[in-house]
Every structure is written in structure tokens, then in C-alpha cells.
Amino acid sequence: MATAVRSGRLSSWQSFCQWVTDTNNRIYIGWFGVLMIPCLLAATTCFIVAFIAAPPVDIDGIREPVAGSLLYGNNIISGAVVPSSNAIGLHFYPIWDAASLDEWLYNGGTYQLVVFHFLIGISAYMGRQWELSYRLGMRPWICVAYSAPLSAAMAVFLVYPFGQGSFSDGMPLGISGTFNFMLVFQAEHNILMHPFHMLGVAGVFGGSLFSAMHGSLVTSSLVRETTENESHNYGYKFGQEEETYNIVAAHGYFGRLIFQYASFNNSRSLHFLLGAWPVVGIWFTSMGVSTMAFNLNGFNFNQSILDSQGRVLNTWADMVNRAGLGMEVMHERNAHNFPLDLATVESTPVALQAPAIG
């Protein structure tokens, strides 16, 4: 080692380490990237192959397989990688645990392969963001912001199946499968009435509003550096020291549009809010899904409001309850699991009132 250093020569391992951690590479690899790249490649390759050609999967564990691939009659909208069978439950199900490849495919082993590699890959991607920020001397807030969508993926692909007792309850990897997951989640957990979901909606929609407001304000107060016949965008030079827009003008406009203290006079605190608002909202949504995974559900307004004559006063909660019961009846209808709230001896009071005829 000492001889190699003195002579200026590096071993193969040292050269590899230097290349992996070199921030001058066109694309930074990093040690987290060494884990991320093969995992995401494996997940992507398996997902594409399964989406195109995977055979039907016995998702409910009742020998009634559900087809999700394109070659079995689906299109881009209806296709999905179907979650692993309810007969597998939470068991780790690699290829070598099945008696044959056909059995592994029938029980939905592809779903576990894709999801586990994907979760490891996106977790390593967050680590890679921190690693590159550290090596460049930047603050670590980029990976903190990325932790919001990462936590959401962990919630629907890992925490929720663990709470429900089977990976068959995980979110299918497809467009209509995602919508089905959302409808069933509402039917079983009343997520619309959960305060954490409400905070998540405020975070996502509020973040979109703030982003649009900020972008439009900046674009409307650019410092003109070009002639009338040229685009404003040509007046910006990459790396220029001076501000590209007039923050005083933007502050004055917005302060007069609403009120003075609704407008930021500090660009740094403004951009912190733009980053923190949606991130905190998505964190709350992830926590909400994680708590509902263990059946700590949204607010339950089963008792309808009655007037002095005993007549139902319809509310939004009644509409949500009726919709939830309908979705619950349609879910897994071949598994013959009748919803418990419809199978009880005492009927659940909902806003159902027969119209007067004649």
C-alpha cells in the first residue's frame, strides 16, 4: 500500500473507490448508488416483463386467479402487477421457496420481487442524495424533502400489508389497480374522515397553489435585460450574481393584493415554506395510512342526525357511509367475505329512506 502511494499508482480497489465517490462524474454514483442501481434495474426489468406477460395471480387465495398483464387481455389502463396471494400472507416468497417457477408466478411472487427491490432502490436514492450533498458541502434538506414520497411508498407497499396481515392487501402496480386500492381503502378505513389525510390534501393542494403563485410572481417581476423583441429568458446568464427578478416589486404587489404580512420579504424563508409545506403534508398522509393499516380508522359517523320526528337529516357523512358500504360489497366479491357491518344482527343506521309512492 505504502509503495503504491509513494509511486503514485493506485490499486484497482482504490481506483474504483475514487471513481464511485468522484463528484466530477457526469452522473454521481456514490456508495448508495452501488446499491441503488442494481436494485432499481432489477425492479424495473421485472415490472416491465410482468406487466407484459405475467400469468394470472391467485390474489385472494381461493383458486380464482386475476389476470393483470397485457398478454392476458389487459390494456395500459387496466394492466397491473397483481399483489402476491393471500395464501402467502406476509411470508417472504423468493423464487427458491416455490416448488416451481409456475407456482411462484401463480402465487404472485413477481410482486414481492418488484416491491422489495423498488423500496431498497428508492431508499438508497435518498441516501445518495445525502451523500452527494455532503461531498459538495451542501445542506441536507434535499434528501429530507425526498423522504416524503419515500414514506408514502413505504406506507402503501410495506406498512399497510404488514398491518393487514398479507401482501395481497398491498397496492397493485398499475393505474386501475391504484384506483381500486384507493376505493377499497376508503371503504374499509374511511380515510376521507381521517385528519392526517386532510392535512395531506392541504399539503399537496396548498403546495401546488404556493408553487403556482411563486412562479407567476417571479415571472411577472423579472428584471428586463433584453429588448422588446426578445424573450425575457435570454436576459438570464447562468451563474449571474445579481437577482433575476425584483423581489421588492413582487412583495409590494402581493402585499397589496391580500395584506402586507401575507407577503414574504425574505427569499430564504419563502423557499423554506415552499419546500416544507407539501413535505409535512405528505408525511402526515403517510402516518395516516400507517395508522389505518392497523385499523385505527378515520372518524366514524354511523349515527345519522334525526329531526324531532325521527326523520333522517342527510349529511355528507351519510353519503360517505353509503358509498363505503357499496364499495365494500363489491370488493373481493368472489371471496364471499360479506362486510361485517352489513352481516351483523342489528342493522347499521345509515341515511336510507324509502320515497313515498302515490
Swiss-Prot record:
The record marks Y160 as: Tyrosine radical intermediate. InterPro entries: D1/D2, Photo_II_D1/D2_sf, Photo_RC_L/M, Photo_RC_L/M_CS, PSII_D1. It catalyses: 2 a plastoquinone + 4 hnu + 2 H2O = 2 a plastoquinol + O2. SUPFAM superfamilies: Bacterial photosystem II reaction centre, L and M subunits (SSF81483). Its main location: membrane. GO terms for cellular component: photosystem II; plasma membrane-derived thylakoid membrane. It is a multi-pass membrane protein. A quinone binds at H214, S263, F264. Tyr-160 forms a radical intermediate that is referred to as redox-active TyrZ, YZ or Y-Z. C-terminally processed by CtpA; processing is essential to allow assembly of the oxygen-evolving complex and thus photosynthetic growth. Keywords: Calcium, Chlorophyll, Chromophore, Electron transport, Herbicide resistance, Iron, Magnesium, Manganese, Membrane, Metal-binding, Oxidoreductase, Photosynthesis, Photosystem II, Thylakoid, Transmembrane, Transmembrane helix, Transport. Fe cation binds at H214, H271. CDD domains: Photosystem-II_D1 (cd09289). The record marks A343, T344 as: Cleavage. Pheophytin a binds at Y125. It is found in: Cellular thylakoid membrane. Chlorophyll a PD1 binds at H197. It is an enzyme of class 1 (oxidoreductase). Its EC number is 1.10.3.9. One of its GO terms (biological process) is response to herbicide. Residues 344-358 form a propeptide. Belongs to the reaction center PufL/M/PsbA/D family. PSII is composed of 1 copy each of membrane proteins PsbA, PsbB, PsbC, PsbD, PsbE, PsbF, PsbH, PsbI, PsbJ, PsbK, PsbL, PsbM, PsbT, PsbX, PsbY, PsbZ, Psb30/Ycf12, peripheral proteins PsbO, CyanoQ (PsbQ), PsbU, PsbV and a large number of cofactors. It forms dimeric complexes. Cyanobacteria usually contain more than 2 copies of the psbA gene. 2 of the reaction center chlorophylls (ChlD1 and ChlD2) are entirely coordinated by water. Photosystem II (PSII) is a light-driven water:plastoquinone oxidoreductase that uses light energy to abstract electrons from H(2)O, generating O(2) and a proton gradient subsequently used for ATP formation. It consists of a core antenna complex that captures photons, and an electron transfer chain that converts photonic excitation into a charge separation. The D1/D2 (PsbA/PsbD) reaction center heterodimer binds P680, the primary electron donor of PSII as well as several subsequent electron acceptors. This is Photosystem II protein D1 3. It comes from Synechococcus sp. (strain CC9311). The lineage of its organism: Bacteria, Bacillati, Cyanobacteriota, Cyanophyceae, Synechococcales.
